[in-house]
From Swiss-Prot:
Keywords: NAD, Oxidoreductase, Tricarboxylic acid cycle. The gene is mdh. The active site is at H188 (proton acceptor). Its EC number is 1.1.1.37. Signal peptide: none annotated. This is Malate dehydrogenase. NAD(+) binds at G12, A13, A14, G15, Q16, I17, G18, N106, Q113, V130, G131, N132. Catalyzes the reversible oxidation of malate to oxaloacetate. GO terms for molecular function: L-malate dehydrogenase (NAD+) activity. It catalyses: (S)-malate + NAD(+) = oxaloacetate + NADH + H(+). Pfam families: Ldh_1_C, Ldh_1_N.
Length: 327
């Protein structure tokens, strides 16, 4: 028997990431090749014509799984009964804009969206915040939606995770799919800490294979952390297709499970690994039955603790910067 369609809300639908994302969702890459979807697309009033153009293209693909499309500039329409919400749209940093101003501008957007989700979304909605600063935006949305379970709100660390995987694959000369138990701690920012101390390839330790702390500290971590800036430098535009791909990976694994594989998700802490509760933090997780679970019992050495503290301090500063807006 055919499955009932799932409602997928996407904000910033007319943007670059949206354009890379929507066709793959409609093709079944995110929720499975047997799962019909209804896309509920949100963007600003001035972007509605552009969204209509994207929808014309979606129609022209004749995707068998695309059961319907809603176009709106009203969050309460976009999030109505949503099973999955991808919050992609965010205020980008303009020239001369202080980080504080960026945080405040986005806090307003994500407060409104959190409240709308709280009012109209499915009680089981899975929310992924892609728009930057993703961790803090996810925290704001979560805090603005008190009637939804806090674990329904997540931030995207999967792009950092995938970037780190590809760097390790290149360094070891091994296929990217053979690398297991590599993950990322912290904020989706250059302070994130990609950790391969437990990673293996075909059962062999990646740390032993690479055996180069200088490469780890001076090449690997900066390359992964500043990859977004390097892409803007090279392409003149920010990474859109790779961000969309990471969003697909994140939701796919959350909904359909990881089969024991460890991945990275930004999730609200319950105090695990000494991270203050409610902090939206990148953790190693496994997913099964539509739920994620933090990998427990990992030893944190002094170097790793130092790196985790740096990214945590940045997140705490961001959180403090928006606290007054949350009432």
């Amino acid at each position: 028997m055919a499955k009932a369609p799932m409602r997928v809300a996407v904000t910033g639908a007319a943007g670059q990431i949206g354009y890379s994302l929507l066709f793959r969702i409609a093709n079944g890459d995110m929720l499975g090749k047997d799962q019909p979807v209804i896309l509920q697309l949100l963007d600003l009033p001035q972007a509605q014509a552009a969204v209509k153009g994207v929808v014309m293209e979606l129609e022209d693909c004749a995707f068998p799984l695309l059961a319907g499309v809603v176009i709106t500039d009203d969050p309460k329409v976009a999030f109505k009964d949503a099973d999955v919400a991808l919050l992609v749209g965010a205020r980008p940093r303009s020239k001369g804009m202080e980080r504080k101003d960026l945080l405040e501008a986005n806090a307003q957007i994500f407060t409104v969206q959190g409240k709308a989700l709280d009012e109209v979304a499915s009680r089981n909605v899975k929310v992924l915040v892609v728009g930057n600063p993703a961790n803090t935006n996810a925290y704001i949305a979560m805090k603005s939606a008190p009637s939804l379970p806090r674990e329904n709100f997540t931030a995207m660390l999967r792009l950092d995770h995938n970037r780190a995987l590809s760097q390790i694959a290149a360094k070891t000369g091994k296929p990217v799919a053979s690398i297991e138990k590599m993950f990322v701690w912290g904020n989706h920012s250059p302070t994130m800490y990609a950790d391969y101390r437990y990673a293996t390839v075909d059962g062999k330790s990646v740390k032993d294979m690479i055996n180069d702390p200088v490469w780890n500290n001076d090449v690997f971590l900066p390359t992964v952390g500043k990859r977004g800036a390097a892409i803007i430098e090279a392409r003149g535009l920010s990474s859109a297709a790779s961000a969309a791909n990471a969003a697909i990976d994140h939701v796919h694994d959350w909904v359909l499970g990881t089969n024991g594989k460890v991945v990275t998700m930004g999730i609200p802490s319950n105090g695990e690994y000494g991270i203050p509760a409610d902090t939206m933090f990148g953790y190693p997780v496994t997913c099964a039955n539509g739920k994620y679970e933090i990998v427990k019992g990992l030893e944190i050495d002094a170097y790793s603790q130092e790196k985790i503290n740096i990214t945590l301090n940045e997140l705490e500063e961001e959180k403090a910067g928006v606290q007054h807006l949350l009432g």
